[in-house]
């Protein structure tokens, strides 16, 4: 079975590579919208992304993985900013506050349609406006929910975190691996002489 990551995110691609499996990447054409709750939003959007790619390539034996992330502050969903000014506004709101990051991951194949959702609480330090301006101008976080990437300079914004770090990055790696492992889609293959002590990973 071939694995396809339905995402344009370089961060999700990098995290998938840590699983040691072969996979392809295809960007889904899905309009993002906020639903009644953050859980429902990431659940539905991750599923739409995976289904879009699956339907496009439905003649193939594939497993498609889609993911979506939102940030929630005081009950309000923050998605990706549409401008640098909006990004600065989001970070000003997050400054010194707790917020919750929700990430959904969908798995779609001819026999599977499952979604897992993970949430993590994050508290930011008080951020000087000059630091916010520096970050937004240098990193231009228009592709990131909440206008920040915890894996880049914005890591210094974080005062406390409660939950899974990779949920905040946008791909809860441990949960993804556990799902694939329990379904029998991730397993060690036999070692080869040219592995130099390592192990290959195969999908069942």
From Swiss-Prot:
Pfam families: Maf. One of its GO terms (biological process) is nucleotide metabolic process. Its main location: cytoplasm. The record marks 11, 69, 151 as: Important for substrate specificity. Its EC number is 3.6.1.9. Keywords: Cytoplasm, Hydrolase, Nucleotide metabolism. GO terms for molecular function: dTTP diphosphatase activity; UTP diphosphatase activity. The keyword Hydrolase applies. NCBIfam families: maf (TIGR00172), PRK14363.1 (NF010943). The lineage of its organism: Bacteria, Thermotogati, Thermotogota, Thermotogae, Thermotogales. It is found in: Cytoplasm. Nucleoside triphosphate pyrophosphatase that hydrolyzes dTTP and UTP. May have a dual role in cell division arrest and in preventing the incorporation of modified nucleotides into cellular nucleic acids. GO terms for cellular component: cytoplasm. It comes from the Bacteria. It is an enzyme of class 3 (hydrolase). The keyword Cytoplasm applies. This is dTTP/UTP pyrophosphatase. Its cofactor is a divalent metal cation. Belongs to the Maf family. YhdE subfamily. The active site is at 68 (proton acceptor). It catalyses: dTTP + H2O = dTMP + diphosphate + H(+); UTP + H2O = UMP + diphosphate + H(+). InterPro entries: ITPase-like_fam (IPR029001), Maf-like (IPR003697).
């Amino acid at each position: 079975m071939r694995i396809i990551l339905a995402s344009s995110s370089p961060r999700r691609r990098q995290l998938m590579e840590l699983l040691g499996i072969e996979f392809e990447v295809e960007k889904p054409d899905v309009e993002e919208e906020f639903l009644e709750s953050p859980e429902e939003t990431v659940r539905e959007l991750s599923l739409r992304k995976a289904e879009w790619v699956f339907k496009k390539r439905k003649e193939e034996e594939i497993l498609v993985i889609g993911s979506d992330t939102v940030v929630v502050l005081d009950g309000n969903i923050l998605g990706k900013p549409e401008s640098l000014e909006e990004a600065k506004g989001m970070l000003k709101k997050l400054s010194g506050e707790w917020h919750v990051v929700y990430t959904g991951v969908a798995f779609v194949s001819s026999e599977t349609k499952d979604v897992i959702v993970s949430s993590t609480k994050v508290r930011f330090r008080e951020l000087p406006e000059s630091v916010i301006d520096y970050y937004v101008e240098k990193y231009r976080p228009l592709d990131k929910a909440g206008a920040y990437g915890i894996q880049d300079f914005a890591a210094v914004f974080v005062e406390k975190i409660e939950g899974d770090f990779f949920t905040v990055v946008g791909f809860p790696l441990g949960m993804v691996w556990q799902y694939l492992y329990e379904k029998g889609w991730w397993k060690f293959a036999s070692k080869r002489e040219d592995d130099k002590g390592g192990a290959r990973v195969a999908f069942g």
